[in-house]
Curated annotation (Swiss-Prot):
Nudix box (motif): residue ranges: 38-59
Pfam entry (one): NUDIX
EC identifiers of the protein: 3.6.1.-
Keyword Hydrolase: yes
Protein name: RNA pyrophosphohydrolase
InterPro entries per the UniProt record, alphabetical: Nudix_hydrolase, NUDIX_hydrolase-like_dom_sf, NUDIX_hydrolase_CS, NUDIX_hydrolase_dom, RppH
Keyword annotations: Hydrolase
Length: 190
């Protein structure tokens, strides 16, 4: 399902633990790390899509998390042509996403990367909040910067830590144009 401008409606998930570290998943059979994300199906709300994707990709249920916030608007990124399926070329531009900030209220052991027959990740780890900006694939970096900055205000407001907001990597702020680990442990799916 694409909108009129060629963007696929999608949700992104920033899942944090009690130390405000973020869940960072390694794409299956690739050396690419990213946040959980996925398309919104016809008739689904962004919240419904978020819970479905959370279960499909991370194995968590609604009772394992608490919603802390979400982005106000759609954040968009363009996908380079060489990543676009041949049959979509000429129509598909990229993703437009609503990002959710979730707090894990369950345990690390509740994470199950094999919750479905088609897993997205084969390993995961907790990383410091800003690490993904240095590690994510380049074409997603601006959207990650926008989402992390907007949601950091919610996450860190009690601790007055927003002074550490990261600067945008490239270009002016626009929703239309879009290292180091904390504990050294990656969690491998099994």
């Amino acid at each position: 399902m694409l909108d009129r401008e060629g963007y696929r409606p999608n949700v992104g998930i920033i899942l944090v633990n009690g130390k405000n570290e973020v869940f960072w998943g390694k794409r299956i059979r690739e050396h690419a790390w990213q946040f959980p994300q996925g398309g919104i199906k016809y008739g689904e709300s962004p919240v419904q899509a978020m819970y479905r994707e959370l279960h499909e990709e991370v194995g968590l249920k609604p009772e394992h998390v608490r919603i802390l916030g979400r982005t106000r608007d759609w954040l968009r990124y363009n996908v380079p042509d060489h990543f676009v399926r041949r049959e979509w070329r000429g129509h598909y531009k990229g993703q437009k996403q609503i990002w959710f900030l979730l707090r894990l209220v369950g345990r690390d052991s509740d994470v199950c990367l094999r919750a479905t027959q088609h897993p997205e990740f084969d390993a995961w780890r907790w990383s410091q909040y800003w690490v993904p900006l240095d590690a994510v694939i380049e074409f997603k970096r601006d959207v990650y910067t926008q989402a992390l900055n907007e949601l950091a205000v919610i996450l860190f407001r009690r601790h007055h830590e927003t002074r550490y907001l990261r600067q945008r990597v490239h270009g002016p702020r626009s929703t239309d144009n879009p290292s180091s680990e904390t504990d050294g442990h990656a969690h491998i799916a099994g």
